[in-house]
Amino acid sequence: MSGRGKGGKGLGKGGAKRHRKILRDNIQGITKPAIRRLARRGGVKRISGLIYEEVRAVLKSFLESVIRDAVTYTEHAKRKTVTSLDVVYALKRQGRTLYGFGG
C-alpha cells in the first residue's frame, strides 16, 4: 500500500511497478492425462486423439467468460481482489449455481 494507511484508495505515491511475466500458451498446461482423468470421471471409456485440443478450447472460452464476470463484480465493488463469492455470483449469472462457497 506504500504509506497510504488502511484502505489506501486514491492517488498518491504508487509503489514501484514489478515486471510481470508475459503469460502465453498456458492452456497447454491442461495436460492430456488431466483431460483423460476428467473424462474418466464422467464415465468415458475411449477418447479420440482430436478431443484434447477441442477440450482445451472449450475450457478456455468457459473460463474466460466466468473470469470476465467475476472481475466485473470485483470492479463494481471497488476491490482489487477477486473473492470466491465473485466467482459464485458469476457462475450463478450464467445459470450454473455452485453451492458450498457462501452466497
Curated annotation (Swiss-Prot):
The modification N6-glutaryllysine is found at K92. Keywords: Acetylation, Chromosome, DNA-binding, Methylation, Nucleosome core, Nucleus. Glutarylation at Lys-92 (H4K91glu) destabilizes nucleosomes by promoting dissociation of the H2A-H2B dimers from nucleosomes. GO terms for cellular component: fungal biofilm matrix; nucleosome; nucleus. Residues 17-21 bind DNA. Pfam families: CENP-T_C. It is found in: Nucleus; Chromosome. Its main location: nucleus. Residues 1-20 are annotated as: Disordered. CDD domains: HFD_H4 (cd22912). It comes from the Eukaryota. InterPro entries: CENP-T/H4_C, Histone-fold, Histone_H4, Histone_H4_CS. The modification N6-acetyl-N6-methyllysine is found at K6, K13. Residues 1-14 have a biased composition (Gly residues). The keyword Acetylation applies. SUPFAM superfamilies: Histone-fold. GO terms for molecular function: DNA binding; protein heterodimerization activity; structural constituent of chromatin. The modification N6-methyllysine is found at K6, K9, K13. The nucleosome is a histone octamer containing two molecules each of H2A, H2B, H3 and H4 assembled in one H3-H4 heterotetramer and two H2A-H2B heterodimers. The octamer wraps approximately 147 bp of DNA. Belongs to the histone H4 family. Core component of nucleosome. Nucleosomes wrap and compact DNA into chromatin, limiting DNA accessibility to the cellular machineries which require DNA as a template. Histones thereby play a central role in transcription regulation, DNA repair, DNA replication and chromosomal stability. DNA accessibility is regulated via a complex set of post-translational modifications of histones, also called histone code, and nucleosome remodeling. This is Histone H4. It comes from Candida glabrata (strain ATCC 2001 / BCRC 20586 / JCM 3761 / NBRC 0622 / NRRL Y-65 / CBS 138) (Yeast).
